[in-house]
Every structure is written in C-alpha cells, then in structure tokens.
Amino acid sequence: MSIKPPSALSELVEALRALPGVGPKSAQRIAYHLMQHDREGAERLGRSLLFATEHLRHCEKCNTFTEAQVCEVCSDPERDPALLCVVETPADQIMLEQTMTYRGLYFVLMGRLSPLDGIGPKEIHFDRLVRRASDGIVKEVVLATNFTNEGEATAHYLGQTLKARGLAVTRLARGVPVGGELEYVDAGTIARAMLDRRTL
C-alpha cells in the first residue's frame, strides 16, 4: 500500500503547479522545502500573497497593477499623452520604463491573442484599448507586444484596427530577438528597439 502525502501538502503542491514554469517535481520540492526548512518564509509568502490580492487592482486608465485607482505613470503630468505604448504584461511595462527612453503612456493587455487557448480580443481588453487610443489625444500607438507568434499576431490585429481609426501605429524595431519576451531582454536592447521603432 502506497503512502499518500497529507491533503494540506497535496493542495500546496497543486497550488504551486499553477505558477508558470513550475512543474510537478519543482512544485513538490518547493512545498517540501517551505514546510521542512522555511516555515517563516512560507508564512511571509502567504501574507504577501494575501496582501497583494487584497490591495492590487487594475489601473482605470492603462490596466496595469496599482494600489490606487490610477497608477503612478498615468498620474504623471510630465508624460506625453499623445503617445500610447501597448504591452502584454506589467513586467513588460517595467522593462520599458527601465530603459528611460519612453515618456508616453501605456496600455497593458494582460495577455496576447491565442485562439487555441481561448484568448480572444475580449480577454486582452481590446475594447478598452480602442476607447483609450481613440480619445482624441493619442496620436501614435507603439505596439510593444513580444516577438513570439502570438505577440506578432496580436500586433497585427491591433495594428489593422487602430490604423483604420486614423492613428499612427508603430512597432518596436527588431533589436528584440524573434521569440523573445521583453521581460527577459536587457534594457539597452529594449531602448534601441524603442528608438528605432517602425511604422506599420
């Protein structure tokens, strides 16, 4: 007869498996480590997760994570409201900010088109983006989706729709490698891609 782990431990392993890049073995190792060697760390992690879920929300304007109704970037009067950069995730937005080359505003899709995974325009907040870009203030939309198949398809779809509304649409230059995700690219490469962006 095989011994099963306690249900509380099994639930922890399953919860960890839901994280990107964490498979069953990694989830099991993390769970056992936390319970055997780092109970204090486990409690801190639990408190931090609970605090984040209770206090983080989406910015009313750009859809990124914030603790206020409107995020710090959207509230900054020094930003250029005529320039709107579209990114897939808040992590991509942070990478672009670290380049210190972009002074416009953002819209965070919270994903990318992936019909096979059931992610269509609604799931990436397409209608909100169109409303934001069509506010009469935005003049150029910079598509900074990743250079993956889904990211390229998302950029193409967004570009066609936004150009039809009379907006100038540009795309990051190819300093970012094909298949690359902004979150993992160095700031210098992203800065060059932003400066060399091309018209679609």
Swiss-Prot record:
The yes or no answer to whether the keyword NAD is present is no
Q: Which stretches are zinc fingers (C4-type)?
A: 59-74
Q: Name one GO molecular function term.
A: DNA binding
- Superkingdom, according to UniProt? Bacteria
Q: Which residues form the Toprim domain?
A: 82-177
InterPro entries, per this entry? DNA_Rcmb_RecR, Rcmb_RecR, Rcmb_RecR_Znf, TOPRIM_dom, TOPRIM_RecR
> What does this chain do?
May play a role in DNA repair. It seems to be involved in an RecBC-independent recombinational process of DNA repair. It may act with RecF and RecO.
Kindly give the NCBIfam families that the UniProt entry links to this protein: recR
Q: Which protein are we looking at?
A: Recombination protein RecR
Originating species:
Burkholderia pseudomallei (strain K96243)
Please spell out the taxonomic lineage of the organism that makes this protein.
Answer: Bacteria, Pseudomonadati, Pseudomonadota, Betaproteobacteria, Burkholderiales
What would be the name of the gene that encodes this protein?
recR
